[in-house]
Amino acid sequence: VSQTRKIAVVLKGYPRLSETFIAQELLGLERAGHDLVLVALRRPTDAKRHPVHDEIRAKVFYLPEYLHDEPWRVFRSLMKSLPKAGFWRALVPFIRDVGRDWTRNRFRRFGQALVLFAEWPAEARWLHAHFIHTPASVTAYASIMAGVPWTCSAHAKDIWTSADWELSEKLGRARWTVTCTRSGFEHLKSLTDEKSRVHLSYHGLDLHRFPSFEGDHSNRDGSDASDPVRILSVGRAVAKKGYDILLKALSLLPADLHWRFEHIGAGDLTKELRTLAEHLGLAPRVTWHGALDQKDVLARYRASDIFALACRVAVDGDRDGLPNVLVEASSQRLACVSTRVSGIPELLNNDENGLVVPPEDPRVLAAALERLIRDPALRRRLGAAAERRVRAEFDHHSSVSQLSGLFESEWRKSP
């Protein structure tokens, strides 16, 4: 890589099982010759790791998640920073931000930036934030303190739950921002005059980790009680994933259909969803696996007949971008049914390479599920078309090379 600089990548948490797309990108950047150090705002909460995490060589540097957890570390950082001009330069925008957002969270982000500035990773000469909400706040303050430029990857929740004034200011300060869905891209472009600094780049998939499935998906059609159709979903048990809608849709399926549903993923709503499944009389047909690593998830894609995800826009505006699990399932020729939310129609076209239904509508979702359960030929057609699209358009190497090019073009401008 020409003009290479050590990049400090600021992440909300690391490693996280639900963020394989970030780990895959980090590994891709390393393999392209970039020198990284990872700066995480919190320690991992997942007991398991994906194989990709073990392949990333970058050192991980943890900031205090809460300032009161490590008061001496924060105090030392403050004492070290007070004599430096960068601290006072960053104080001005921070005070302005506090005037518009008087929250503990705001003070925490400035404190974390202070620790990053005081304990600066050796030789880091560029900052890159993953997520435009809290990680970008820490990065923006640290950038001013250290006099080091920054860039940003924006995703989904971070875009849709942030105030427009804050997004506009961050887009103006970052050298460039990249995002992973057209809906997010258009929204961010509408908030800045620097439209050429906002870029669209789909994460794509490391297709070596998701090689073509050489076997065949089954001809199950829901008529055999001893061999039910297998429906799979992978995703965190959180509101935006719409698992309550999916369970209600399953409860509306005709009594003569034989199926089983498996869920993979952890999350705050797991207990509530299990209770709902019992209340709807679905418990005997539902398996809750919790979080699994990538190898086990791949095996479940291959053993299943249908992949279902009922994404929605949550009450607070949170929503998915383009859920990576839909790309993964499609790579295994698994017929997918999902909703018309955010970036999902950028992957799935209804009746062409998947079924796409309106969000928040269990009846329409149930009708789509019934079609797929009863018709293995339809599943094969949709699954084959979905795989062709993923392998042609969603290879993560193109995303990594685009990012690499963006970094290098900035470095040529400011040697």
Question: What does each of the following model-derived ranges do?
Answer:
Residues 22, 29, 231, 246-247, ...:
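A structural motif in glycosyltransferase catalytic domains
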Residues 183, 204:
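Carbohydrate-associated surface elements
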Residues 302-317, 334:
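Acidic donor-binding loop of glycosyltransferase active sites
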Residues 163-165, 189, 205-227:
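Acidic anion/phosphate-binding donor-loop and adjacent secondary structure
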Residues 326, 331, 335-338, 348:
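Short hydrophobic beta-strand element within catalytic cores of glycosyltransferases
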Residues 347-351, 355-362, 371-377:
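Conserved acidic donor-binding segment of nucleotide-sugar-dependent glycosyltransferases
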Residues 291-293, 299-304:
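Short alpha-helical donor nucleotide-sugar binding micro-motif in glycosyltransferases
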Residues 118, 225-237, 243-288, 295-296, ...:
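A conserved nucleotide-sugar
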